[in-house]
Amino acid sequence: MIVNLSRLGKSGTGMWQYSIKFLTALREIADVDAIICSKVHADYFEKLGYAVVTVPNIVSNTSKTSRLRPLVWYVYSYWLALRVLIKFGNKKLVCTTHHTIPLLRNQTITVHDIRPFYYPDSFIQKVYFRFLLKMSVKRCKHVLTVSYTVKDSIAKTYNVDSEKISVIYNSVNKSDFIQKKEKENYFLAVGASWPHKNIHSFIKNKKVWSDSYNLIIVCGRTDYAMSLQQMVVDLELKDKVTFLHEVSFNELKILYSKAYALVYPSIDEGFGIPPIEAMASNTPVIVSDIPVFHEVLTNGALYVNPDDEKSWQSAIKNIEQLPDAISRFNNYVARYDFDNMKQMVGNWLAESK
């Protein structure tokens, strides 16, 4: 089997974490003949003992939206297809992102969400999710996704048989995180680099939090992040809000462990790793009242209507009513351990024979 990680961006991101854990689980169950990856990641995978096929760094993803990169990938992917066919023939190929390699029929892609179908970040993304991805989903041998909510959305939106779609949940290792009982007076927002993350809804409802708490926003250097910074200035919150970029995992663990709560009011999500990571850090989470969070977090989270000030007020007040035991969220986090992911990878291999 070939694993296509050619569009995988920088290490440490949610996509990177999912891909590495997926690869680890797959390797314990099946033979992995080679990894397709960007040159910048080649050394990492070679040290793990994988045979590597490299692609130029320019085709991998970054935290910045690029109008050029998808076009470069589209052209380059045909050359990559020929390389793969010549070297590996019709071997099974799986990609942990939604990007296909043309001409290859025996491949599986991973569609983490179809949010861009409804809320695209660019015109190219809109065209891709509404037309090109639809064709890819129909052509591919199988499709993976990260929640049953997204599975249903893919089947309905692209009119494909749900039996062609398998779910493999994200994995979080509780021991990677720091559990603290004592919390500091700041809310934390993680991954707030794009408009659908909707952290502006929390900022603009400043009356419910800014008198008693601060806000730390971990995000990329994107247009949306710049708009948030301007909003903070306009609302006279500069002394209450801190923006952090390029945060390491070790730094993020500390932020999680000390936060009074994570706020994650997304309009749409495929799964949502930060709320699980926050729970692994004994930190309460406030999330938007959308179906995927009810699937993933069940009754472990506090739910809000992000546009309703009273809803935010109620959620923040309810944090005080939560159990204070340091193990209060362990049962929710345990649903997403590595063994569960490995079992779901095994189920996919059985379903897609």
Swiss-Prot record:
Gene3D superfamilies: Glycogen Phosphorylase B (3.40.50.2000)
GO biological process, one term: lipopolysaccharide biosynthetic process
Catalytic activity of the protein: alpha-L-rhamnosyl-(1->3)-alpha-D-galactosyl-1-diphospho-di-trans,octa-cis-undecaprenol + GDP-alpha-D-mannose = alpha-D-Man-(1->4)-alpha-L-Rha-(1->3)-alpha-D-Gal-di-trans,octa-cis-undecaprenyl diphosphate + GDP + H(+)
GO molecular function, one term: glycosyltransferase activity
Enzyme type, top EC level: transferase
EC number: 2.4.1.378
Pathway: Bacterial outer membrane biogenesis; LPS O-antigen biosynthesis
Keywords from the named record: Glycosyltransferase, Lipopolysaccharide biosynthesis, Transferase
Keyword Glycosyltransferase: yes
Domain of life: Bacteria
Function: Mannosyltransferase involved in the biosynthesis of the repeat unit of the lipopolysaccharide (LPS) O-antigen region. Catalyzes the addition of a mannose to the rhamnosyl-galactosyl-undecaprenyl diphosphate intermediate.
PANTHER family with a match to the protein in the record: GLYCOSYLTRANSFERASE WBBK-RELATED (PTHR46401:SF2)
Similarity-based family: Belongs to the glycosyltransferase group 1 family. Glycosyltransferase 4 subfamily.
Protein's name according to its UniProt entry: O-antigen chain mannosyltransferase RfbU
Gene giving rise to this polypeptide: rfbU
